[in-house]
């Protein structure tokens, strides 16, 4: 008996239990669909399953079962759609970031001469309205992304994450969709009655989800970049939150002192702002401090910076949590520390 057309015939009532057993045994044939013949179900198998007396089933051959159509992955469709030299297709990136309907791509230099055609292929398959080339990271305290638009129209978009709508222009302001787990954690970490100070609010990455899901008494959101500040205000409006007070300017000048029950420092080069954070903290406060740190210094440098800042301010500090979020660059990680000040 050949193996390519093997099926197991079983009564309808026993079919689902048998199908599960065959799948667990690795015998279920994924290339053919299950069929019906009157009161019986025909389950395709890749080899003889052995004794099936417990199911009152029999094994036979049947070449009439419909084959499953092969499903191409989005990347396979992109490779097929790209109108470039066949020899260049091996350089197409298999990873990308979708921010709303704007696509952000990192392209190797080999694709520099055909990047418009490449962008069009990705956009057509993924449904993007515009494509940005990531030219490596962000710049300065304003956290301006280094990108170039290579295809499409307007880059302003609305990105949905964890039930929150973020309006932004990823060509002008930073956004990382890969930080969703940390945003989800922070969204629910505050307590009713708290005053939260977000020293680097951006477009509201942490402040807006926290306002929606945790509902603290007040969130004071500081942002130095006027473009990001515009979107911070817009995101408070479109998500209908009223407990956020946006403040435009350097947080060292704008953040009120002695008021915070919780402080968020989401800027990865915030060491120079720690003295201000100590002044912003109320008598008891929790600090969430982010840093881009060389891997060999993760266990020492960030916590040492916090302890030294607390000592200068005459404060006590307790480490609650140190967590590596993701790789930031070769040999460098994005970490976050939760600490309690008293």
Predicted regions located by residue number:
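SAM-dependent transferase fold signal centered on methyltransferase-like domains
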Residues: 1-342
């Amino acid at each position: 008996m050949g193996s390519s057309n093997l099926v197991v015939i079983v009564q309808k009532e026993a079919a689902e239990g048998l199908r599960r057993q065959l799948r667990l045994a690795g015998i279920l044939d994924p290339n053919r669909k299950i069929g019906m013949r009157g009161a019986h179900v025909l389950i395709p198998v890749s080899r003889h399953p052995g004794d099936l007396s417990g199911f009152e089933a029999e094994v036979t051959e049947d070449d009439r079962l419909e084959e499953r159509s092969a499903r191409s992955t989005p990347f396979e469709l992109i490779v097929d759609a790209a109108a470039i030299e066949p020899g260049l297709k091996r350089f197409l990136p298999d990873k990308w970031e979708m921010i709303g309907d704007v696509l952000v791509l990192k392209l190797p230099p080999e694709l520099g001469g055909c990047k418009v055609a490449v962008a069009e292929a990705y956009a057509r398959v993924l449904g993007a309205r515009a494509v940005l080339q990531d030219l490596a990271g962000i710049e300065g305290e304003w956290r301006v992304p280094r990108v170039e638009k290579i295809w499409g129209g307007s880059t302003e978009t609305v990105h949905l994450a964890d039930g929150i709508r973020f309006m932004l222009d990823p060509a002008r302001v930073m956004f990382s969709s890969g930080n969703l787990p940390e945003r989800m954690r922070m969204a629910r970490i505050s307590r009713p009655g708290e005053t939260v100070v977000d020293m680097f609010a951006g477009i509201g990455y942490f402040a807006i989800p926290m306002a929606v899901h945790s509902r603290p008494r007040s969130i004071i959101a500081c942002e130095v970049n006027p473009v990001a500040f515009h979107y911070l205000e817009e995101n408070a409006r479109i998500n209908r939150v009223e407990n956020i007070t946006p403040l435009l300017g350097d947080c060292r000048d704008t953040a009120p002192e002695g008021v915070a029950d919780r402080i968020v420092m989401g800027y990865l080069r915030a060491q120079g702002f720690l003295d201000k954070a100590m002044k912003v903290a109320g008598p008891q406060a929790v600090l969430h401090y982010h840093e881009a740190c060389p891997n060999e210094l993760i266990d020492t440098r960030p916590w040492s910076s916090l302890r030294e800042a607390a000592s200068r301010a005459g404060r006590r500090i307790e480490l609650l949590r140190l967590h590596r979020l993701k790789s930031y660059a070769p040999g460098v990680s994005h970490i976050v520390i939760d600490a309690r000040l008293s």
